[in-house]
Regions:
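Pyridoxal 5′-phosphate
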Residues: 1-378
Length: 378
């Protein structure tokens, strides 16, 4: 199969990641739950991985790197832990439901009021709206780094500066960019960065986390076993234990650690250059085919995603045909991004997303171009 659904999950993992998970399953104990060698080795792997993530994302304190099972959990921890009744929040039309649904629920429960920065017909945010929507009670701007639908990126350094100038927190969903695009929390004024391991970081599913700037207090989202301060009735106050109740996914974190080593060895810039070259090759190959509509802005910063429709064909039918007759994996439908589809006018038809990763080749791209051309001519 030609796998072009990497914005959902990166299918092909580096061999070192697979080896690390297999080794961990036979050697790792439960970190913080014993003084024997297996428990201590697990604790060392977990702490080392915190340090690697802190270095990658520009987080000044590894203890403020919190492990979760994915970015959805990370976002729920952040968004349910920083707001008080009466707070105002700004988000955008580019968001995934992992941002939207926690915010909608908080709005429904009367905790927050909520405004959205609109996107235009190409999926670009109105940057002036970030300023115009600011209120005295604005507690945070919450936004994605890149749309999972179009690949268009938000200039988070620009938005972070606006948030900092107004005394608001800046929470970033880096699901589509972690490992694929350089991120520096300090330079970009990011207060809370939420990420997943199974996409650009090329780590196992079930890994992810959030990085928290010093001085930011987040209430625990879940409480329970911590391995320390066990006689206290409340969850320990210090990070990371404050937000990490229960046994961590040590086996997955071992794989994430190996993935970070691989990423550092190859280099994010090299990976980004390769992915963008594949994306550009595909875009150039399909953009002039009659009956093809492509969504998004290809003149600004973006990820390696091309989303399109063929004539008025149902996007799910197109994706099914690509899989069945051409052995090409893509993602159709709504992509958990309803507001973006409404901005693009594709809420009924959906769209077919092609997303490229480090392991893809030019041969993969050329086969996909040929398939799209043939289907458009049917």
């Amino acid at each position: 199969m030609i796998y072009l659904d990497n914005a959902a999950t990166t299918l092909v993992k580096p061999q070192c990641v697979i080896d690390a998970v297999v080794a961990a399953m036979g050697t790792m104990g439960n970190a913080g739950r014993g003084a024997h060698g297996n428990a201590l080795s697990s604790a060392r792997v977990i702490y080392d991985t915190r340090c690697k993530l802190a270095a990658l994302f520009g987080c000044t304190n590894p203890e403020n790197v919190i492990f979760t099972c994915n970015s959805t959990e990370a976002l729920n921890i952040a968004l349910n832990g920083i707001f008080e009744p009466g707070d105002h929040v700004i988000s955008t039309d580019l968001e995934h439901n992992s941002v939207l649904r926690p915010l909608y629920r908080l709005e429904k429960e009367g905790v927050i009021s909520l405004d959205f920065v609109p996107a235009d017909k190409q999926g670009r945010p109105d940057y002036a709206a970030f300023e115009n929507l600011m209120k005295p009670n604005t507690r945070a701007i919450v936004c994605t780094h890149a749309s999972n639908l179009t690949g268009n990126m938000i200039d988070i350094a620009r938005v972070g500066k606006i948030a900092r100038e107004h005394g608001a927190l800046f929470v970033v969903d880096a699901s589509q960019t972690a490992g694929a695009v350089p991120i520096d929390m300090e330079a970009m004024n990011v207060d809370i960065l939420c990420f997943t391991g199974h996409k650009g970081l090329m780590a196992p599913q079930g890994t992810g986390g959030l990085c928290i700037r010093e001085g930011i207090e987040i209430r625990p989202f879940k409480v329970g076993g911590s391995g320390v301060h066990s006689y206290e009735k409340e969850q320990p106050a210090d990070y990371p234990t404050r937000l990490e109740a229960g046994t961590l996914n040590g086996h997955g974190i071992a794989g994430l650690s190996a993935a970070l080593d691989y990423l550092n060895e190859v280099g994010i810039e090299a990976i980004r250059d390769h992915e963008m070259a594949l994306m550009t090759r595909f875009y150039e190959g399909v953009k002039n085919i009659e009956g093809i509509t492509i969504y998004g802005d290809f003149e600004s910063e973006r990820t390696a995603v091309v989303t399109l429709n063929i004539h008025d064909f149902d996007s799910s039918a197109v994706s099914d045909e690509l899989a069945e007759y051409y052995d090409i994996a893509t993602r159709p439908g709504a992509h958990c991004a309803p507001r973006m589809h409404m901005a693009l006018g594709t809420e009924e038809q959906g769209a077919v997303r092609f997303s490229f990763a480090w392991f893809n080749t030019t041969e993969d791209v050329d086969a996909a171009i040929a398939a799209v051309k043939e289907m458009a001519e049917e």
